Amino acid sequence: MSRIGKLPIPVPNGVEVKIGTDVVEVKGPKGSLSTPVCSLLQYEQADGHVVLTRIEDDRVTRAQHGLRRSLLSNCIDGVTKGFSKALEVIGVGYRVAVKGNIIELQVGYSHPVLVELPEGLKATVEGQVLTISGIDKELVGEMAARIRRIRKPEPYKGKGIKYATETIRRKVGKSGGKK
């Protein structure tokens, strides 16, 4: 049995989980999310927990078991606590600003790069740290990765956009001038 899939998902107070035929809807204090139902699994809700059990025991079902449990757990965590990713903008003259739902990045190009935030995400700036937050973990991570991709950190000086938890492996420059 899947080690992750067999764990029951605790449903905190104030969170409502509706298991439908096609989708599982989760409503909480921060909003509502939904995740598709896998037809290979059986969803059961009892005494403050949601448990996923496999109908068959083939390879595809085992693969889906842990995945669907994690997706549902992320929905419950999102509507209660929310998720956030912090990005650091490092470099001389590199700046970041948030204007409504548009992030303006000045990261060494001849023009400012504008990134529009999708609905449901919020961005805040403190100094050189940009924080993306929202209730959908997948959307928060995808948006942070898109912003990082605009100017990845380079290994010689470390300039660029990096995750706050990321460490950049630095390289030694050329040792020129020796004859």
Swiss-Prot record:
GO biological process, any: cytoplasmic translation
GO terms under cellular component: cytosolic large ribosomal subunit
Entry's Gene Ontology molecular function annotations: rRNA binding; structural constituent of ribosome
Domain of life per record: Bacteria
Pfam families xrefs: Ribosomal_L6 (PF00347)
Secretion signal, residue range per the UniProt entry: none
Record's keyword terms, sorted: Ribonucleoprotein, Ribosomal protein, RNA-binding, rRNA-binding
Entry keyword Secreted: no
InterPro entries, alphabetized: Ribosomal_uL6-like, Ribosomal_uL6-like_a/b-dom_sf, Ribosomal_uL6_a/b-dom, Ribosomal_uL6_bac-type, Ribosomal_uL6_CS
UniProt feature coiled coil, ranges: none
Family to which the UniProt record says this protein belongs: Belongs to the universal ribosomal protein uL6 family.
Function summary: This protein binds to the 23S rRNA, and is important in its secondary structure. It is located near the subunit interface in the base of the L7/L12 stalk, and near the tRNA binding site of the peptidyltransferase center.
PANTHER family listed in its UniProt record: 60S/50S RIBOSOMAL PROTEIN L6/L9, LARGE RIBOSOMAL SUBUNIT PROTEIN UL6M
Quaternary context: Part of the 50S ribosomal subunit.
HAMAP family: Ribosomal_uL6_B
Record protein name field: Large ribosomal subunit protein uL6
Organism of origin: Desulfovibrio desulfuricans (strain ATCC 27774 / DSM 6949 / MB)
Source lineage: Bacteria, Pseudomonadati, Thermodesulfobacteriota, Desulfovibrionia, Desulfovibrionales
